[in-house]
């Protein structure tokens, strides 16, 4: 019951503060100071007062964690900074090599790292503005994830309103959503009692709970959020461990096993301690993450295209089991790679029922000598990917034959080829092969290919599933009424996509070549081919020796191009695209002009005011230059715009010539660009 004789607003605020404090003590600190019945009484009083005074309800009130009705679907969230994955270490030697690279790059020995358990859950990013939770999303592809705000609000270890003071006006808190082992067991017991299929493991339970359209279901799953960092917040401190301390002070849960360690020996010792305690932990883990603690050092180390150079995940040893191979099947991936997959008698491994295991490639099948009917040892590498580690040859049945790679793609019938420098066999069906369709279409529409704005993964998936698009040429037959009928499309988005498709009909020969997705043909190679041959017909009809004469095209790339165009299906795709109106201007090899910057390597950094970095890159490459993403002793020039950062400092230390934007413009004008 609500108290009488007091100011309702003041009492509501007092109740909210008290409930937030108890939530923090219970769900973050694991140190409650009142009984559940007392907590329930406080919440009941707050809810009663807010019911009497609905004008006083605020989104960050503890009573508003659970939305009242299911959502119709998940929207998208664009992360302020990409949520990159981590490189993995599967053996101690991998960790030692990582430490060596870091020490060498920084000139430090030893390096101080922050070590933390790699929780086996779902990574999420939670955005706060002025101290209040406004948005939450999954990792997704690293740039765009699914909006799960209402579900994340139900997690009691996630503050709806930040504690303390000193937090930035905007920040994205990154972390892992997990479910305790004990809560997972109770959840599965209840699902069995309700006649539902139990979850295979805690990670699946956590991920499935976050993707419920009804947040009331999520609220009943007792999820926990552990933060492991922050983005888009500016410089909060000098080190990662200080940032974690600040996040803890603002109300977030930081894993109690996070520690600072010194050098490789400290990393090893932490790993062994955590491994020894693994079965006693309340949460599932699948490894240890090591991060360079000093944030200036992180900036100096930088990133690769997919992962930071200052962090690594050392995977824990997998658990193994014995089972029997029913048969070996060739599986065609989205890039055309054909992977032998062993179909197994189902067996439990690390809490998961395993019925298939990858054999990677033909060399691996031969090395392990896996055959149909064999008894094998199976493990989940890093507790995730099932693989066969050994064959018990003593139990091999008589007449078991070695497995052979098929000569034709099991999906489309195209030639299967192993390029000279590759371990994998590939289907040469390219854009024609149904198994490669979605991946090929996404590549075809990507920014550096035909740049079809609005044709993302979810749209392509629907178009393929509904049979609306079987080849790239089908894209150009799509009409507004067809697109508007897709999920989360709408009239305006359909109009925009139709316009983008129409615009994409007018492209360039290098972009078209790149869009075809030929193995080893990137944007630079595509441009070299266009410049060397001048027309698509000349490229399609060239043999391997003629192709290999192209600058930057060696025998392996020439082989891939020749086999791609030797496949009749691929020629039919090209013909269909031209019939659909895709055009470009041919390049006259005789009029390509000089390449005055051939052999010179440039690096671009910072913000340019007169052009984008992509435009600057294109202009330099048109003059024969190579544009790299990192500074090294082989770099000839660094073009430094505003806020150039660590690349400028490294260039100066290596004696690399630095050009400002004005000097770049002068260089381009000198050569007629």
From Swiss-Prot:
Domain BRCT: 592-673
GO MF entries: DNA binding; DNA ligase (NAD+) activity; metal ion binding
Record GO biological process: DNA repair; DNA replication
Binding site for NAD(+): 36-40, 85-86, 116, 139, 176, 291, 315
Listed Gene3D superfamilies: 5' to 3' exonuclease, C-terminal subdomain, 6.20.10.30, BRCT domain, DNA ligase/mRNA capping enzyme, Helix hairpin bin, Nucleic acid-binding proteins
Keyword Ligase: yes
Domain of life: Bacteria
Any one GO CC term of the record: cytosol
CDD domains: BRCT_DNA_ligase_like (cd17748), LIGANc (cd00114)
HAMAP family for the chain: DNA_ligase_A (MF_01588)
Function, as annotated: DNA ligase that catalyzes the formation of phosphodiester linkages between 5'-phosphoryl and 3'-hydroxyl groups in double-stranded DNA using NAD as a coenzyme and as the energy source for the reaction. It is essential for DNA replication and repair of damaged DNA.
PANTHER family, sorted: CHROMOSOME TRANSMISSION FIDELITY FACTOR 18, DNA LIGASE
Family, per entry: Belongs to the NAD-dependent DNA ligase family. LigA subfamily.
The protein's name: DNA ligase
This protein's encoding gene: ligA
């Amino acid at each position: 019951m609500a108290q009488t004789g007091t100011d309702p607003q003041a009492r509501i605020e007092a109740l909210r503060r008290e409930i937030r404090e108890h939530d923090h003590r219970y769900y973050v600190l694991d140190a409650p100071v009142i009984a559940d019945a007392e907590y329930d009484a406080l919440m009941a009083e707050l809810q009663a007062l807010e019911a009497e005074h609905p004008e006083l309800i605020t989104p960050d009130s503890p009573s508003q964690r659970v939305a009242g009705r299911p959502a119709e679907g998940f929207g998208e969230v664009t992360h302020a900074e990409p949520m990159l994955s981590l490189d993995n270490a599967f053996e101690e030697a991998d960790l030692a090599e990582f430490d060596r690279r870091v020490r060498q790059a920084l000139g430090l020995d030893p390096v101080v790292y922050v070590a933390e358990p790699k929780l086996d859950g779902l990574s999420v990013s939670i955005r706060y503005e002025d101290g209040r939770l406004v948005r939450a999303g999954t990792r997704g592809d690293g740039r765009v994830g699914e909006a799960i705000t209402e579900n994340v609000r139900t997690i009691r270890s996630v503050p709806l309103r930040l504690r303390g003071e000193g937090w930035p006006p905007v920040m994205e808190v990154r972390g892992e959503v997990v479910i305790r082992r004990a809560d997972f067991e109770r959840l599965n017991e209840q699902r069995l009692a309700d006649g539902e299929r139990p979850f295979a493991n805690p990670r699946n339970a956590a991920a499935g709970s976050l993707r419920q359209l009804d947040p009331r279901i999520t609220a009943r799953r007792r999820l926990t959020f552990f933060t492991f960092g922050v983005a888009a917040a500016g410089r909060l401190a000098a080190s990662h461990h200080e940032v974690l301390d600040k996040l803890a002070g603002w109300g977030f849960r930081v894993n109690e096993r996070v520690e600072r360690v010194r050098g490789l020996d400290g990393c090893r010792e932490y790993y062994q301690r955590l491994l020894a305690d693994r079965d006693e932990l309340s949460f599932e883990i699948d490894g240890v993450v090591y991060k360079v603690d000093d944030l200036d050092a992180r900036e100096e180390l930088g990133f690769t295209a997919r992962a930071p150079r200052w962090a690594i995940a050392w995977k824990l040893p997998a658990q193994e089991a014995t089972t029997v191979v029913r048969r070996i099947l060739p599986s065609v991936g989205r890039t055309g790679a054909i992977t032998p997959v062993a179909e197994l008698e189902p067996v439990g491994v690390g809490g998961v029922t395993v019925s298939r295991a990858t054999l990677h490639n033909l060399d691996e099948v031969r090395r392990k000598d896996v055959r149909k009917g064999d008894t094998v040892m199976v493990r989940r590498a890093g507790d995730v990917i099932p693989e066969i580690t050994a064959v018990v040859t003593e139990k091999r049945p008589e007449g078991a034959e070695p497995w052979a790679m098929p000569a034709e793609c099991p999906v489309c019938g195209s030639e299967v080829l192993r390029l000279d420098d590759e371990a994998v066999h590939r289907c040469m069906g390219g854009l024609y092969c149904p198994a490669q369709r979605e991946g090929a279409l996404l590549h075809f529409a990507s920014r550096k290919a035909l740049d079809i704005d609005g044709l993302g993964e979810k749209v392509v998936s629907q178009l393929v599933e509904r049979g609306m698009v079987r080849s790239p040429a089908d894209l150009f037959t799509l009409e507004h009424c067809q697109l508007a009928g897709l999920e989360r499309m709408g009239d305006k988005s359909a109009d925009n996509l139709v316009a983008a498709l129409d615009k994409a009909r007018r492209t360039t020969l290098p972009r078209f070549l790149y869009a075809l997705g030929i193995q080893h043909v990137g944007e630079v190679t595509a441009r070299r081919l266009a410049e060397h041959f001048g027309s698509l017909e000349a490229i399609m009809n060239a043999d391997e020796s003629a192709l290999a004469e192209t600058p930057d095209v060696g025998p392996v790339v020439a082989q891939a191009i020749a086999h791609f165009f030797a496949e009749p299906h691929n020629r039919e795709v090209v013909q269909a695209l031209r019939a659909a109106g895709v055009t470009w201007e041919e390049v006259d090899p005789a009029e390509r002009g000089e390449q005055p910057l051939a052999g010179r390597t440039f690096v671009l950094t910072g913000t340019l005011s007169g052009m984008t970095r992509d435009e600057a890159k294109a202009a330099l490459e048109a003059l024969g230059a190579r544009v790299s993403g990192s500074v090294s002793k082989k770099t000839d020039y660094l073009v430094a715009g505003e806020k150039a950062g660590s690349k400028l400092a490294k260039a100066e230390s290596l004696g690399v010539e630095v050009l400002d934007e004005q000097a770049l413009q002068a260089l381009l004008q000198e050569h007629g660009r």
